[in-house]
Swiss-Prot record:
UniProt function note: DNA-dependent RNA polymerase (RNAP) catalyzes the transcription of DNA into RNA using the four ribonucleoside triphosphates as substrates.
Domain of life: Archaea
Subunit structure: Part of the RNA polymerase complex.
Family of this protein: Belongs to the archaeal Rpo12/eukaryotic RPC10 RNA polymerase subunit family.
SUPFAM superfamilies: RNA polymerase subunits
Alphabetical keyword list: Cytoplasm, DNA-directed RNA polymerase, Metal-binding, Nucleotidyltransferase, Transcription, Transferase, Zinc
Subcellular localization: Cytoplasm
Gene of this entry: rpo12
Catalysed reactions listed for this entry: RNA(n) + a ribonucleoside 5'-triphosphate = RNA(n+1) + diphosphate
Cofactor binding annotation: Binds 1 zinc ion.
Cofactors (names): Zn(2+)
CC terms in the record's Gene Ontology section: cytoplasm; DNA-directed RNA polymerase complex
InterPro entries: RNAP_P/RPABC4, RPABC4/Spt4, Rpo12
Protein name from the UniProt record: DNA-directed RNA polymerase subunit Rpo12
Amino acid sequence: MVEERKLYICMRCGRTFSRSEMEILPGIRCPYCNFKIIMKVRSPTVKRIPAV
């Protein structure tokens, strides 16, 4: 099985979790503390764009 990356972080408890963990509860909430405000984690790689 392919390991799923952790994409979201809770603004209250600070835990990171994946979308599949978030789908356990109805609606968009933290699966650990049931808080509604979550943030998507940015990717660690830098996107380079050539200058025009």
